[in-house]
C-alpha cells in the first residue's frame, strides 16, 4: 500500500491570511459571548490587531519567493506587495468603519434583520450598543483578498473570490440610513456577482479541457500547467480563448471595468459609505492583483492574442467612466464613475508587456486607495438631520461653511484629476510611461484624452463648493471623531507624499514586480 503524500505547507508564509481568518472567527465568538456594551471596542481592537499583525508577517516574509500548499498559493513579490497594500488600506477603512461619534448609533444597522422604527432600531438611535457583525465580515473579506492576489491556480482563485465576495454582499446591506436603497444595492451586487462567478467557473472548466488536450502532460488549472499548455499550442484554441474570455469577465466584474461595471454606481450609492470606501480601495487592489497574476503568469504566452481585446475594454472603461461622471448629480455616484475610469487606467498598466507595467499598476493601486478612502471620509462628514447629504446641489457654498474640509476635498479631487505634485499625477505617469515604452501608445492617448474629460466633473464640484453661495439646504460638516480624523489625515498626507516623493514606493514596487512560476 503506497504511502499518502501530503503537500508541504509553509505556515509562516500563510500567516497573514491565517491571522485574518482566525480574527474573523474570534469576532464571531465575541458577538456571541461578550456583553453588548463592550462588543464594539473589543471587535474593533481584534480586527485592527489582526490587520497590523498580518502586515507585520508580510514584512517578515518580504524576501520569500516560493509556492506552497501543492502549488495553490504563490508567495512572491507582487503577492506580498499587494497583500501589504490591502492590509494598510484595510486598517484605514477600519478607522472609518469603527467611527461612532459622527452619527449617533453609528452608520450601520444594529442587526441585518432589524426593520426600521422597530424597538431595536430606536434603541440604536438612542446611542445604545448594537450588534457588531460588520467587523468579522470585514475580516473575512480581507482574508479572501489576501488569498485572491496570491492564488496560483484557478480553483484557489475562485474560492478566494467567493470568500471575499460573500461578506461584501452582506456589508452593502447594512446601511442604517436609506435602508431600502442599501438592501437593493446589495441584492443587485449579489445577483450580478453570482453571474460573474458562474462565468469565471465555466472559464476554469474550458481551460482545464484545453490543458487536457496537450499530449504527454497532465491536465490541470494551476498556472504552470496552463502556461506550458499555451506555450506548446497544440490544443484547441477555442477552449483557450473561450476560457480566457470567461475568466476575464469574472475578474473584470470585480475590477468594475466596462461593460461589466453596471453594478458599481448603485452599490457605491447604496452601501454604507465606509464600506463603499473599503470596496473602492481594497477590492480594486484584489481584483487587479488577480488580473496581473492571470495574464502575466498563466496566459503570458497568449499575450498578443488578448492584448487588443483587453485594450478595447480599457478604452471603453475609460470612456464610460469619464463621460458618465460628467452627468452625475450625486457625489457617491460621481466617485463610482471615477472608480470605473480609474479601472481603465489600471488596465493600461496591466497590458504593458514589462515588469514596469506590473510595478506601475501596483503603485497606482496604493496611491488611488489612499485618495479614495480620504474622499469617502469627507463624504461621511457632510450631513444633515437625515444623514449624509450626497446630492451635489447640497454641496453649494460648502467652502464658505467649512473651508478646511472643503479644501481637503478639493485637494483630493485635484489628485484624481492628475494635477502634478499629487499621487494621481505620478501614478498615471507610471502606468502610461510603461504602456508607451511597451508599444501601447494608442492606450496612452486614450488615457490622456479621457483624463481631460474626467477633470470636468471634479472641477465642477470644486467650483460648486467655492464659488457658489451657500443656501438654506447647504448642510454643515460635522466634527469628525479621532478615528475619521486619523483616516482622513493618513489619506491626504499619503496623497501629497506620493506626489512629491514617489520614488521610494516606486522602487519598492519595482523590486517586487517579478512573479514566481
From Swiss-Prot:
GO cellular component: plasma membrane
Transmembrane segments: 14-34, 40-60, 77-97, 131-151, 154-174, 189-209, 238-258, 272-292, 306-326, 334-354, 362-382, 404-424, 451-471, 481-501
Top-level enzyme category: translocase
MF GO annotations: NADH dehydrogenase (ubiquinone) activity; NADH:ubiquinone reductase (non-electrogenic) activity; quinone binding
Claim: NAD is one of the keywords in the record: yes
Keywords: Cell membrane, Membrane, NAD, Quinone, Translocase, Transmembrane, Transmembrane helix, Transport
EC number: 7.1.1.-
One GO BP annotation of this record: ATP synthesis coupled electron transport
Location in or out of the cell: Cell membrane
Predominant place of localization: membrane
Coiled coil stretches, renumbered: none
Membrane protein topology class: Multi-pass membrane protein
Family: Belongs to the complex I subunit 2 family.
Quaternary structure annotation from Swiss-Prot or TrEMBL: NDH-1 is composed of 14 different subunits. Subunits NuoA, H, J, K, L, M, N constitute the membrane sector of the complex.
HAMAP family with a match to the protein in the record: NDH1_NuoN_1
Function: NDH-1 shuttles electrons from NADH, via FMN and iron-sulfur (Fe-S) centers, to quinones in the respiratory chain. The immediate electron acceptor for the enzyme in this species is believed to be a menaquinone. Couples the redox reaction to proton translocation (for every two electrons transferred, four hydrogen ions are translocated across the cytoplasmic membrane), and thus conserves the redox energy in a proton gradient.
Protein name as catalogued: NADH-quinone oxidoreductase subunit N
Species this protein is from: Salinispora arenicola (strain CNS-205)
Gene that produces this protein: nuoN
Amino acid at each position: 500500500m503506497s504511502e499518502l503524500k501530503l503537500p508541504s505547507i509553509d505556515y509562516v508564509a500563510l500567516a497573514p491570511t491565517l491571522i485574518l481568518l482566525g480574527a474573523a472567527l474570534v469576532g464571531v465568538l465575541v458577538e456571541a459571548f461578550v456583553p453588548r456594551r463592550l462588543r464594539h471596542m473589543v471587535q474593533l481592537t481584534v480586527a485592527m490587531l489582526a490587520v497590523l499583525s498580518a502586515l507585520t508577517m508580510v514584512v517578515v516574509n518580504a524576501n520569500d519567493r516560493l509556492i506552497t500548499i501543492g502549488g495553490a498559493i504563490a508567495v512572491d513579490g507582487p503577492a506580498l506587495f499587494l497583500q501589504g497594500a490591502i492590509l494598510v488600506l484595510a486598517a484605514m477603512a477600519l478607522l472609518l468603519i469603527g467611527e461612532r461619534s459622527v452619527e449617533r448609533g453609528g452608520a450601520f444597522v444594529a442587526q441585518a434583520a432589524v426593520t426600521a422604527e422597530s424597538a431595536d432600531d430606536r434603541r440604536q438611535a438612542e446611542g445604545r450598543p448594537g450588534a457588531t457583525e460588520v467587523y468579522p465580515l470585514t475580516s473575512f473579506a480581507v482574508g479572501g483578498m489576501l488569498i485572491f492576489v496570491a492564488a496560483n491556480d484557478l480553483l484557489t482563485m475562485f474560492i478566494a473570490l467567493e470568500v471575499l465576495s460573500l461578506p461584501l454582499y452582506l456589508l452593502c446591506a447594512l446601511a442604517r440610513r436609506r435602508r431600502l436603497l442599501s438592501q437593493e444595492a446589495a441584492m443587485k451586487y449579489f445577483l450580478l456577482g453570482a453571474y460573474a462567478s458562474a462565468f469565471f467557473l465555466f472559464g476554469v472548466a474550458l481551460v482545464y479541457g484545453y490543458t487536457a488536450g496537450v499530449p504527454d502532460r497532465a491536465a490541470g488549472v494551476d498556472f504552470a500547467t496552463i502556461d506550458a499548455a499555451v506555450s506548446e499550442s497544440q490544443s484547441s484554441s477555442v477552449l483557450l480563448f473561450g476560457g480566457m474570455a470567461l475568466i476575464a469577465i469574472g475578474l473584470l466584474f470585480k475590477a468594475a471595468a466596462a461593460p461589466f461595471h453596471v453594478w458599481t454606481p448603485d452599490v457605491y450609492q447604496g452601501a454604507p459609505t465606509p464600506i463603499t470606501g473599503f470596496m473602492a480601495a481594497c477590492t480594486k487592489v484584489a481584483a487587479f492583483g488577480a488580473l496581473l497574476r492571470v495574464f502575466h503568469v498563466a496566459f503570458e504566452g497568449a499575450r498578443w492574442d488578448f492584448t487588443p481585446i483587453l485594450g478595447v475594454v480599457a478604452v471603453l472603461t475609460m470612456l464610460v467612466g469619464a463621460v458618465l461622471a460628467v452627468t452625475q448629480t450625486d457625489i457617491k455616484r460621481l466617485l463610482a464613475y471615477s472608480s470605473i475610469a480609474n479601472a481603465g487606467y489600471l488596465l493600461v498598466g496591466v497590458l504593458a508587456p514589462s515588469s514596469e507595467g506590473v510595478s506601475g499598476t501596483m503603485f497606482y493601486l496604493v496611491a488611488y486607495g489612499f485618495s479614495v478612502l480620504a474622499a469617502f471620509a469627507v463624504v461621511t462628514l457632510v450631513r444633515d438631520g437625515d444623514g449624509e447629504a450626497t446630492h451635489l446641489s447640497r454641496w453649494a457654498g460648502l467652502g464658505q461653511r467649512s473651508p478646511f474640509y472643503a479644501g481637503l476635498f478639493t485637494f483630493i479631487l485635484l489628485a484624481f484629476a492628475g494635477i502634478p505634485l499629487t499621487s494621481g499625477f505620478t501614478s498615471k505617469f507610471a502606468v502610461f510611461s510603461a504602456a508607451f515604452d511597451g508599444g501601447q501608445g494608442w492606450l496612452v492617448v486614450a488615457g490622456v484624452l479621457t483624463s481631460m474629460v474626467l477633470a470636468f466633473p471634479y472641477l465642477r464640484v470644486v467650483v460648486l463648493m467655492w464659488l457658489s453661495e451657500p443656501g438654506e439646504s447647504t448642510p454643515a460638516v460635522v466634527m469628525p471623531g479621532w478615528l475619521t480624523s486619523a483616516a482622513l489625515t493618513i489619506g491626504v498626507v499619503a496623497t501629497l507624499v506620493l506626489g512629491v516623493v514617489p520614488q521610494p514606493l516606486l522602487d519598492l514596487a519595482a523590486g517586487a514586480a517579478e512573479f514566481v512560476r
